[in-house]
Amino acid sequence: MIKVIFFDLDDTLVDTTKLAELARRNAIENMIRHGLPVDFETAYSELMELIKEYGSNFPHHFDYLLRRLDLPYNPKWVSAGVIAYHNTKFAYLREVPGARKVLIRLRELGYRLGIITDGNPVKQWEKILRLEIDDFFEHVIISDFEGVKKPHPKIFKKALKAFNVDAQEALMVGDRLYSDIYGAKNVGMKTVWFKYGKYSKEELEYREYADYEIEKLQDLLKVIENENGSNKEVHPAR
C-alpha cells in the first residue's frame, strides 16, 4: 500500500518552464534598455547557450554573457538583468494547474508528502515558500544540499529513510523520465510520469520505467486510488 507520495518540484508542482523563459527574455530586454549594445536575438541566443553549458542554477549567467559577447564588464548591465529576472520570477511564479487542490486532497486522505528536487536549496525553498505550500510536506530533499542529484539512488534512499518507509510504500511523481522516473523505479518505488512542460516529449527511452502516465495533476488521485485497491478505472502506462 502506498503511504508516502514524493513530488519533483519544477514543472511538477511549480510551473517553471514558462516562467524561466519569460524571466530570461525580460532580463535581456532590460539590459538592452540600460545600454547593452547588442540586439535581442544575439544576446538571448548566447544566454541560452550559457544555460545549456553551465546549468540553470549557475549564479553568474549575466556576467559570463558579457564575456561571450566580447564586452567589458559593466555592473549596470548585469544588475539590470538580475533585477528584471527576479522581478519577473516573483510576479509570475505560479503552481502547476490543480496542484494545491491535489495536495489538499492527498493530505485529507492521510497520505504523507515529500519533495525530491534537484537545484540550489535557497532557490528551491524560495519557490516553495512564496507559493505557501511548505506546510504540505514533511520533508524536502534537495540535491545541492545532499551532494547527489537524481537519478542517483542515494537521494531517493535518503528520502525513504527520512519517512522510515520501504520503497514499495512510496510513489514518485515527476516530469523527467530520466531523473525522476528511472531514478525512483531503480530503488523500487512506484512511478507516475507527469507529462508537463518542456520534457513531455523527451527522454522517451526511459518511458518503460513509468508505472503510470498523467497529463493533468488531478489524475494522480485516480492513480492513488487504483494503487490502493479502491479504483479500477486507471490504466497503467503503455
UniProtKB/Swiss-Prot annotation:
GO terms for molecular function: metal ion binding; phosphatase activity. Pfam families: Hydrolase (PF00702). InterPro entries: HAD-like_hydrolase, HAD-like_sf, HAD-SF_hydro_IA, HAD-SF_hydro_IA_CTE7, HAD-SF_hydro_IIIA, HAD_sf. Its cofactor is Mg(2+). It comes from the Archaea. Its EC number is 3.1.3.-. SUPFAM superfamilies: HAD-like. GO terms for biological process: small molecule biosynthetic process. It is an enzyme of class 3 (hydrolase). Transmembrane segments: none annotated. Gene3D superfamilies: 1.10.150.520, HAD superfamily/HAD-like. Keywords: Hydrolase, Magnesium, Metal-binding. Catalyzes the dephosphorylation of D,L-glyceraldehyde 3-phosphate in vitro. Belongs to the HAD-like hydrolase superfamily. This is Glyceraldehyde 3-phosphate phosphatase.
